[in-house]
C-alpha cells in the first residue's frame, strides 16, 4: 500500500537532524532517503528545523535559512519531497514576502509551524492573521504544531480563514485528541496528522475514524524524532477497513499536497 508521510523534518546534515540519539546515525539526504525507504514510504513533506536555537537578534534570517534548506532538499530529493516553509508573526512583511517567493517556486505548504522553537505562541494574534490572509490568496495549506494550552487560539485561527486548509500535528493523549475531534467535526477545512504522540495508543485511529471519518486523518511520523516503520505498522494494525487505511496513508495527503 502506498504511504505518504505528511509530517517529517528532513535534513541536509547533523545541524538539522532532530533525533534523541544522533550518534547512532550519519545524517545526510542520502541516508534520509534510505531510512524512509525501509518503511516503504514513497513521499515525504515537512519543514526544516534547526538544532541551533532561534534568537530575536538573528530574527527572520534564521527563518529564511531554514526555508532555503528546504528548497535545497527539494533540489536534491526531487519528487520524493514536498517542502514546507516557516513564517513568523514578529515579521509580517518578511513572512508575506516569503509566501510570495515560495508560491512563485510552486511551494504551497506552510509548516509545520513550531512556535515554541521560534519565540512566539499565539495562533490567533493579529500579526499571524495578516500573514494567513496573504496565504489564503495563494491557496496554501498550513501545518501547525498542537499547542496544548492554545485550544481557543487554534480554533480562532481556523475559523478566521475558511479558505485555508489547516492540519494540526499530533493527536496527543486522549484529553487533547478529543478536543481535536470536536474541531474536525465542526470545520471542513481542518485535518489532523497522526504524527508524534498518540497512535501508539491502540484504537486511537479507529476511534477517530468512527467519530469523524478517515477523510480527516492524515498519516505522519515526525521523522527523524520517531521511528517511521513503527508508525506505518500502527495504522496497518488498526481495526479499520482497507479503504480507511488508504485514505489515511496516502489519499488525504495526495489531495492536500496535490500530488499523484
Predicted regions and their residues:
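Active-site gating/metal-coordination segments in enzymes
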Residues: 58-141, 199
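Conserved, mostly hydrophobic/aromatic
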Residues: 7, 36, 70, 102, ...
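Mobile, glycine- and charge-enriched loop segments
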Residues: 1-22, 67-86, 188-191
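Divalent metal-dependent hydrolysis catalytic cores, especially in the metallo-beta-lactamase
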Residues: 8-9, 30-56, 81-86, 108-112
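Catalytic pocket-lining loop regions of alpha/beta-barrel enzymes
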Residues: 108-109, 122-218
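A cross-family glycoside hydrolase active-site/sugar-binding cleft signature
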Residues: 7, 47, 84-86, 111-113, ...
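Acidic-and-aromatic substrate-binding clefts and catalytic sites of carbohydrate-active enzymes
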Residues: 21-27, 52-62, 87-95, 117-124, ...
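Mid-to-C-terminal alpha-helical segments outside catalytic/metal-binding sites
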Residues: 1-10, 15-43, 214-216, 229-260
Amino acid at each position: 500500500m502506498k504511504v505518504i508521510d505528511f509530517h517529517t523534518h528532513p535534513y541536509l546534515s547533523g545541524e538539522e537532524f532532530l533525533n534523541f540519539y544522533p550518534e547512532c546515525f550519519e545524517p545526510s539526504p542520502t541516508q534520509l532517503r534510505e531510512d524512509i525507504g525501509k518503511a516503504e514510504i514513497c513521499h515525504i513533506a515537512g519543514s526544516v528545523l534547526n538544532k541551533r536555537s532561534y534568537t530575536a537578534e538573528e530574527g527572520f534570517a534564521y527563518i529564511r535559512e531554514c526555508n532555503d534548506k528546504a528548497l535545497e532538499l527539494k533540489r536534491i530529493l526531487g519528487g520524493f519531497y514536498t517542502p514546507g516553509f516557516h513564517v513568523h508573526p514578529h515579521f509580517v512583511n518578511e513572512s508575506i514576502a516569503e509566501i510570495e517567493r515560495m508560491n512563485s517556486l510552486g511551494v504551497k505548504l506552510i509548516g509545520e509551524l513550531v512556535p515554541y522553537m521560534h519565540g512566539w505562541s499565539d495562533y490567533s494574534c493579529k500579526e499571524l492573521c495578516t500573514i494567513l490572509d496573504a496565504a489564503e490568496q495563494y491557496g496554501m495549506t498550513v501545518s501547525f504544531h498542537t499547542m496544548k494550552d492554545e485550544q481557543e487560539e487554534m480554533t480562532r485561527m481556523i475559523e478566521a480563514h475558511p479558505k485555508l486548509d489547516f492540519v494540526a500535528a499530533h493527536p496527543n493523549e486522549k484529553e487533547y485528541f478529543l478536543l481535536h475531534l470536536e474541531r474536525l467535526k465542526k470545520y471542513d477545512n481542518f485535518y489532523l496528522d497522526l504524527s508524534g504522540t498518540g497512535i501508539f495508543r491502540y484504537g486511537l485511529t479507529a476511534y477517530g475514524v468512527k467519530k469523524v471519518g478517515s477523510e480527516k486523518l492524515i498519516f505522519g511520523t515526525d521523522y527523524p524524532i520517531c521511528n517511521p516503520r513503527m508508525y506505518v505498522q500502527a495504522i496497518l494494525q488498526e481495526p479499520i477497513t482497507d479503504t480507511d487505511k488508504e485514505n489515511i496513508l496516502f489519499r488525504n495527503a495526495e489531495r492536500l499536497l496535490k500530488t499523484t
